[in-house]
Amino acid sequence: MRCEQAAIPGLVDGRGREIMLGMTSTTTFARGQFTETPEFLEKLDRLAQVAVRVGLGLGEGQEVVMTATLDAVPLTRRIIEHAYKAGASLVTTFLSDEQSALLRFRYGPDASFDKAPSWLYDGMAEAYRSGAARLAVTGNDPSLLSKEDPEKVSRVNRATSKAYRPAMELITKHEINWTIVACATPAWARAVFPDLPEEEALARLWSAIFAASRADQVDPVAAWQKHDAGLHARADCLNAKRYSALHFRGPGTDLRVGLADDHLWLGGGTTAGNGRYCVPNMPTEEVFTTPHKDCVEGHVTSTKPLSYQGTMIEEISVRFEAGRIVEARASRGREVLQRMIETDEGARRLGEVSLVPHSSPIAASGLLFLNTLFDENAACHIALGQAYSTCLKNGDTLTKEELEARGANDSLIHVDWMIGSNRIDVDGISATGASEPVMRSGEWA
């Protein structure tokens, strides 16, 4: 499951650029123009509607804290509209400018890379404790920081993760209702469709987002309700099996993932601690659970590139012993990968294992989105770092020590990367050691 980190700071008031919207024939995104059509505007409005009604499950009188980049303003304005129509008492939006973030790397003093605006993230955490919902709009440039010093990037990520942790803990424990949705942006579109003109690339990316988010359907809310029921049924089936481990086999992969004691499989929406039902990731095609942090053995190879905090990591290959990564390689971004797993001890261990059929709509699109929210829903994946306590029986009532005793991992990070394909087989291992097929050639057995 994608758990969006706080954006690298570069906050503006939303007036740093003129962004025309609504009655005009074109929307000016940060760089370049995208031609609107009535059909596009209708789908954009549907996306905003399902983000609020289905993704967030917003309650009457609830506040909303939203984060996004400047490029996402055409979508965020519609989300704000639907949030107020749904009864929001206040919507507060924090907009970040990616180009401002780059200026920090080019002109900021060395000490700045160990700093993060704790006051801002503490305020977000306080808002969540006071009952606010959280909505993140993703669409960042996958390679924004690819040319910057990996050591500085790592320091910024660590400082941000530490400062954001009080808020992130409320999110990973599902104490609040939250969701992540996507907005096509020029930089992201160029990365996905490098050979197309900018306007065509944006149109193609928007089309893919609408389809994956079911905003291209006449009644997207009903479509999501049906899809959500299917994911819950799959999770129920896996919970009934009570596997003690999963065994992944495929090219470059022979990995046994032990599952945490009293683990639960989840999929689709969930009821947060505040009683609101939400779908945290839009889109979502996964069912997932918590591995045992000390019971992972073998080696595994990534099947898709990972876009991590503005840098690309490709062809990841790691080896686990007693749950811990003891060897890690990558054909590109190896230094970034190494620094990521050195964030803390938990960064070398798994916090999530997820099953996704190769025939999922996102995989069937044939696109490499270079965005974890989408790519993780095209393939089975694992996540390094923080576990979700909700994937344990009564996990939301357990102390940190009790969670650890059951095998749940603890870390500043939670980074998903893809290991599934149409050449991956997955077996379920029972407590007695018996094995049975769960997936064959990337599909449910």
Question: Where are the regions a protein language model picked out?
Answer:
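Extended hydrophobic packing segments that form well-structured cores
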Residues: 401-445
